Amino acid sequence: MESIEQQLTELRTTLRHHEYLYHVMDAPEIPDAEYDRLMRELRELETKHPELITPDSPTQRVGAAPLAAFSQIRHEVPMLSLDNVFDEESFLAFNKRVQDRLKSNEKVTWCCELKLDGLAVSILYENGVLVSAATRGDGTTGEDITSNVRTIRAIPLKLHGENIPARLEVRGEVFLPQAGFEKINEDARRTGGKVFANPRNAAAGSLRQLDPRITAKRPLTFFCYGVGVLEGGELPDTHLGRLLQFKQWGLPVSDRVTLCESAEEVLAFYHKVEEDRPTLGFDIDGVVIKVNSLAQQEQLGFVARAPRWAVAFKFPAQEQMTFVRDVEFQVGRTGAITPVARLEPVHVAGVLVSNATLHNADEIERLGLRIGDKVVIRRAGDVIPQVVNVVLSERPEDTREVVFPTHCPVCGSDVERVEGEAVARCTGGLICGAQRKESLKHFVSRRAMDVDGMGDKIIDQLVEKEYVHTPADLFKLTAGKLTGLERMGPKSAQNVVNALEKAKETTFARFLYALGIREVGEATAAGLAAYFGTLEALEAASIEELQKVPDVGIVVASHVHNFFAEESNRNVISELLAEGVHWPAPIVINAEEIDSPFAGKTVVLTGSLSQMSRDDAKARLVELGAKVAGSVSKKTDLVIAGEAAGSKLAKAQELGIEVIDEAEMLRLLGS
């Protein structure tokens, strides 16, 4: 049996190894939750055996050494980390410790914030001008990232307003919105560049570039959450007051900062944020809870590496480790072959996960994945679980190579990969049962034809029994035929028939989207419908004419043109119309006759809106003569940026396109 000294040595060595991978290499091998567990184990052992604590133990410092490639900045006020709690019981124990330690009977008010999952930085302003910026580093010394931070548009180069201190060091988090992260990885996959495991790694990798021009191209943003150095000026005597003051001076502060009067209110805040987490547009891994009063903060003081007056209340881990038992290949509605890892089931963020996407052959090669490997699985919000990385240091001896199929696993047709594309596809078309199933599921989906009650299992049975081959066949179904399906009684069957009848009345945009043309999403379908007005005009359009539509380039135009050039597709459309599918005649909106600031403009919406849904905003803009596109290009006239706007906002700024916020949009809509 190992001695206590040996256990401590092994834990410290393991933690230092993972700190190096995380802080220096930007290539973490294990999830945060596993690191936290190891750190807790070490801290518990050291608490029981304080005589064995060493000065270089990971519990005695904040992080790891800075990268040698950057010059170093010594923090005048150390950048400490926070202690963590992981459940309500631990938070309530922290709350009690704070109450017990305060000598007075003053009420404690809590300032609660989001715990952003990015990179902690300090930014020094002298007489209101940004003069330097640094990473946390080891808490005492960080990396000089001034040139890179100056490229982040959310961070003001000069503060504005009155009573700005002579020297003010603000602290906060640089992070990457989800949309920006997806765009970076999409571009990387297309060009063979580095694909990041998660937005935090992408933010760190973007900020720690030796070439600031690369950082400038990444849609990084920033929220301020604290202060370090303060000279030649005063700040409010509460934490919230300071954040509001920073906001007045032009520093970005999260609008989710909330003052809580009791532990019960803090817990309610925690659960509300946890509920809202999937819709924020950026990654968080918990909430930060701070004593609001600066006087009480001073009274509570610090321990070696963290303040006694604050704690991070972390959410259940979104990353966990497990083993890949097999890799299978699924076929999508456009024939795309997607490898899926079959996993040893593991709970991730409160959900039992047994499958994870591997995207494509390039991703398997990038990961270096073999069947039998130990891997890190990530699940964020509604995102499909994915394999983040392989734990190479724990690779079993009996792993097997993943062999990508040369023939479709469903219909046996050849698999081809077009040059320049990452995705391999089955060439079987609608003779492939898998493609037929997925096409029909898309056709009846809520955002397409919206056939209520026709779920995936019904479609699977209809295809397997060969009752349905094309979307038009759906409208020929009878209650009698449906009653023969598994778990389908006469009443349920009649409900489905009624839903199909109701779905015949649709819109031109929904109909186009339901057809499942490659690269034609909802926004593009709406743009095509608005521009051409009728099916006949769209079918007759040339590739050149199609490219006049906002959001349509040569690739999309070619897909649309080729779809309508295919006789079998035209036949299906004719059958659908013969079965009674219809939509209202187009209402021609002449932008020149509309007195509106949006008339005739191509507008792009990005980020989340708080006062109306995206669909309502789009409809209102179209009524006022705007063309609403799904992506930013040189054709775009205006971008409306909501909360947590990502890569579209960054591209608009890069192209010099006018940008307004939601408040200005609402003002113009009402004018």
UniProtKB/Swiss-Prot annotation:
Among InterPro entries, the record links this protein to: BRCT_dom, BRCT_dom_sf, DisA/LigA_HHH, DNA_ligase, DNA_ligase_AS, DNA_ligase_CS, DNAligase_adenylation, DNAligase_N
Question: Which protein, by its recorded name, is this?
Answer: DNA ligase
Q: What cofactor is this protein dependent on?
A: Mg(2+); Mn(2+)
- SMART domains tied to this protein: BRCT, HhH1, LIGANc
Q: Please cite one Gene Ontology biological process associated with this protein.
A: DNA repair
| Chemical reaction(s) catalysed | NAD(+) + (deoxyribonucleotide)n-3'-hydroxyl + 5'-phospho-(deoxyribonucleotide)m = (deoxyribonucleotide)n+m + AMP + beta-nicotinamide D-nucleotide
Question: What is this enzyme's EC?
Answer: 6.5.1.2
Kindly indicate whether the keyword ATP-binding belongs to this entry.
no
| Pfam families assigned | BRCT, DNA_ligase_aden, DNA_ligase_OB, DNA_ligase_ZBD, HHH_2, HHH_5, Nlig-Ia
Q: Which domain of life is it from?
A: Bacteria
Which terms in the GO cellular component ontology are assigned? cytosol
Membrane-spanning parts: none
What family does this chain come from, according to its entry? Belongs to the NAD-dependent DNA ligase family. LigA subfamily.
